[in-house]
């Protein structure tokens, strides 16, 4: 069974993984994959009622900021 506690652990693992691949400047494809994994898991947690609207939005927009800030830095050298 998926409990809120187990879901939080899984979300944290995915968030840390996304942060790591972005911070360590892995390939753009790998960063995009990690971002997609994390944001997809956020949406699943929201759909299952584990996250409320506000918490989903907060985490999603933070992930979006991290990913797109890194992508902009990568493009601008």
What are these model-predicted stretches?
Residues 1-77:
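Acidic, Ser/Pro/Thr-rich low-complexity regulatory regions
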């Amino acid at each position: 069974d998926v409990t809120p506690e187990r879901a939080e652990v899984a979300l944290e693992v995915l968030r840390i993984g996304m942060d790591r691949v972005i911070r360590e400047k892995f390939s753009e494809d790998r960063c995009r994959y990690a971002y997609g994994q994390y944001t997809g898991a956020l949406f699943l947690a929201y759909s299952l009622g584990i996250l409320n609207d506000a918490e989903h939005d907060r985490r999603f927009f933070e992930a979006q900021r991290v990913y797109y800030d890194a992508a902009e830095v990568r493009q601008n050298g």
